[in-house]
């Protein structure tokens, strides 16, 4: 980072980011610029502010794909009634704690041209990273309705507003699936779907590494593991006869 003094603005960038994300600043560096005018210094300061802002946004996007120890999810009974908040890590450890979740299927086109947009989860994901799944999944925040949480995550992961992706609830599934590393998914999972215009997605690459349009006629092969298996909650939703029928109906509209 070019600077008038070695510690400015390189140190300021590191200090700002360390403060924002509560992490230690290990080092910073810069090099001296001879005969810098007032305008030159102002340009450097303005550019530094822009860089800090851009880095904050980028790191925030990456951190959304990880788990904060302070994160909570909503524990529920088998019928979906809420018990109360539970630590997210605890909810996914060992036998798990049944908690609220949602998944959303996005559809492009109608009739014979309809395509289900399956998305590959980023390798950054703690559970089932790199696996093909529904278009977007997540957990509602404490005090947030399921549909509102699904709309929020569509904005964060796919860049879609609620107007671009009006949600229809298709049903729900209740399941538990071991991840094989001492963690699991144990969810009461609402299933949503929405029609979107072709090319509307603006994916967050820290969340999604691939968008794959799939014809409804290809779904059974994916459920059998060909050409590859789906995330367990995606497979279970598509195996549910009522959910599948409502999804097919939506594709015809």
Which positions does each model-derived feature cover?
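Short, internal acidic amphipathic alpha-helical interface segments
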Residues: 1-22
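Phosphate/ribose-phosphate-bearing ligand recognition and processing surfaces
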Residues: 20, 26, 31-64
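Nudix hydrolase/Nudix homology domain
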Residues: 66, 130, 173-253
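Acidic, metal-coordinating catalytic segment for phosphate/diphosphate chemistry
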Residues: 66-111
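Conserved Nudix-box catalytic region and its N-terminal flanking loop in Nudix hydrolases
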Residues: 89-101, 112-156
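Short, solvent-exposed loop/turn segments that connect beta-strands within catalytic domains
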Residues: 109-115, 180-182
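A short coil-to-beta-strand element that immediately follows conserved catalytic motifs
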Residues: 161-171
């Amino acid at each position: 980072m070019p600077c008038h003094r070695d510690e400015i603005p390189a140190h300021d960038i590191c200090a700002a980011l360390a403060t924002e994300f509560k992490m230690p600043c290990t080092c910073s560096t810069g090099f001296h610029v001879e005969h810098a005018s007032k305008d030159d210094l102002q340009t450097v300061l303005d550019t530094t502010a822009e860089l800090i802002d851009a880095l904050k946004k980028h790191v925030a996007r990456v951190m959304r794909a990880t788990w904060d120890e302070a994160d909570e999810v909503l524990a529920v009974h088998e019928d979906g009634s809420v018990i109360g908040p539970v630590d997210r890590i605890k909810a996914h450890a060992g036998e798990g704690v049944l908690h609220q979740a949602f998944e959303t299927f996005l559809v492009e086109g109608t009739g014979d041209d309809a395509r289900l947009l399956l998305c590959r989860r980023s390798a950054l994901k703690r559970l089932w990273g790199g696996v093909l799944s529904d278009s977007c999944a997540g957990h509602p925040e404490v005090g947030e309705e399921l549909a509102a949480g699904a709309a929020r995550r569509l904005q964060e992961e796919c860049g879609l507003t609620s107007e671009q992706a009006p949600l229809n609830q298709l049903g729900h599934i209740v399941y538990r699936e071991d991840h094989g590393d001492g963690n699991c998914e144990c969810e009461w999972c609402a299933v949503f779907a929405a029609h979107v215009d072709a090319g509307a997605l603006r994916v967050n690459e820290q969340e999604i590494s691939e968008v794959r349009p799939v014809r409804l006629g290809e779904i059974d092969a994916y459920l059998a593991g060909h050409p590859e298996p789906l995330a367990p909650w995606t497979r279970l939703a598509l195996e549910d006869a009522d959910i599948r029928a409502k999804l097919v109906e939506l594709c015809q509209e």
